[in-house]
UniProtKB/Swiss-Prot annotation:
Exonuclease involved in the 3' processing of various precursor tRNAs. Initiates hydrolysis at the 3'-terminus of an RNA molecule and releases 5'-mononucleotides. GO terms for molecular function: 3'-5'-RNA exonuclease activity; nucleic acid binding; nucleotide binding; ribonuclease D activity. It comes from Haemophilus influenzae (strain ATCC 51907 / DSM 11121 / KW20 / Rd). Keywords: Cytoplasm, Exonuclease, Hydrolase, Nuclease, tRNA processing. GO terms for biological process: tRNA 3'-end processing. Belongs to the RNase D family. This is Ribonuclease D. Its EC number is 3.1.13.5. The gene is rnd.
Length: 399
């Protein structure tokens, strides 16, 4: 085979030497880690590296919390598939997550971060997300790992095992190969993207956005059950009295879900909770008439009626405020168009407007300005990090 064979990816360095990427010459080789001693050994080796690739496989179908099925770790030499169902002492892995000298590399990491926080009460720091790196290289806002591996490494990642059961044991060879591949290719991909990013002015912006993802993960875990009613679709259509019922019902549902580790919809569907809050049924027959399932009424009906009785005793002074929708404001359409045009003109060369500001972050900024809520802890995303100079100009346009 010629050393210039186009099917073999190469890294090009400034000294003109060409280095073949080892991960592209061979399928991933790995070990399955199933005991505390082996985990300690793996993590001690990883602690000596400047960067490691991480991924997780988990299940979240009928449960409130994701069920961790596997952790993948690649330190540049060894791929370790860590079995969380077999290991009892994860302190070496937690120490690795927290080690400030080891960069943790993930791809599209928001769900992985939630799993780490839930299981280990520790986020990977420092952390960089290759999907965010790709965003600043003009590769789309949500480029998948398989797409990037194809583009930069000329390899195809088989995604056939994506939807399999990661809790059932033993894991199949296909599952293990799939899981190993995600980190096997992630590390060399990171090194390529790192070199590409160094040619741009966006290295700090990538770090800022990775920090933003970490901060959002903390906020998600700290969600207040008293505010769970705000997550119910169409809650804004209810008046304060109806919202007082919904607040009681949604808080109850979330607390039960956490206590019993059940998906929210397995207790009562959100649309049915909304109907109960709207219509205030007096008996289980009325619940059935408004569309609740027989199972919901049989298992939860009596409890729901007790909660409604409790809600009737709430003073009108303690009702939640009506939910304001920014899109209902008569100024909204003109303002959002103005800001979108402003973002287009302020977007730096090499970036797309979608990276600078989404409709959601523009609405967040409008609310912040119009409500005069200028507390630092509630500052919108557009006034944080690399976006701040642009956000400040948008604020000026709103005044």
């Amino acid at each position: 085979m010629s050393k210039w064979d186009s099917n073999i990816p190469f890294l090009f360095f400034s000294n003109k030497k060409i280095t073949m990427i080892k991960e592209c010459q061979n399928p991933p080789h790995f070990r399955v880690v199933t005991d505390n001693t082996a985990l300690l050994e793996v993590c001690n080796l990883a602690q000596q590296k400047s960067a490691v690739a991480l991924d997780t496989e988990f299940m979240r179908v009928s449960t409130y919390f994701p069920k961790l099925g596997l952790i993948q770790l690649y330190d540049g030499e060894h791929v370790s598939l860590i079995d969380p169902l077999a290991i009892t002492d994860f302190s070496p892995f937690v120490a690795l997550l927290a080690n400030p000298k080891v960069l943790k590399i993930l791809h599209s990491c928001s769900e992985d971060l939630l799993v780490f926080l839930q299981e280990f009460d520790q986020l990977p720091r420092p952390m960089i997300d290759t999907q965010i790196m790709a965003r600043f290289l003009g590769l789309g806002t949500s480029a998948g790992l398989a797409k990037l591996a194809q583009q930069y490494l000329n390899v195809e990642i088989d995604k056939g095992a994506t939807r399999t059961n990661w809790i059932k044991r033993p894991l199949s060879d296909i599952q293990l190969q799939y899981a190993a591949g995600d980190v096997w290719y992630l590390l060399p991909l990171y090194h390529i993207l790192e070199k590409e990013l160094a040619k741009t002015p966006w290295e700090q912006a990538v770090r800022d956005d990775c920090e933003l993802v970490l901060a959002k993960t903390h906020k998600l875990q700290e969600r207040d059950s008293e505010k769970a009613y705000l997550d119910i679709p169409n809650a804004w259509k209810l008046n304060p009295l109806e919202l007082s019922r919904l607040r009681v019902l949604a808080q109850w549902r979330q607390n039960v879900a956490i206590e019993r580790d059940l998906a929210l919809s397995y207790i009562v569907k959100s649309e049915h909770l909304w109907k109960v809050a709207k219509n205030n049924p007096r008996n289980t027959s009325e619940m059935l008439e408004m569309g609740l399932t027989e199972n919901e009424v049989r298992v939860r009906g009596k409890e729901i009626l007790q909660l409604l009785s409790q809600a009737r005793r709430i003073s009108s002074n303690d009702y939640p405020k009506s939910i304001e929708r920014i899109s209902e404001d008569p100024r909204y359409k003109k303002t959002i168009r103005l800001l979108q045009e402003k973002v287009n003109s302020l977007t730096p060369e090499g970036l797309t407007p979608e990276i600078v500001a989404s409709k959601r972050t523009l609405e967040e900024l409008i609310k912040w300005v119009w409500k005069y809520d200028c507390s630092q802890d509630k500052r919108p995303e557009l006034l944080i990090g690399w976006r701040k100079p642009i956000g400040e100009k948008l604020v000026d346009a709103l005044k």
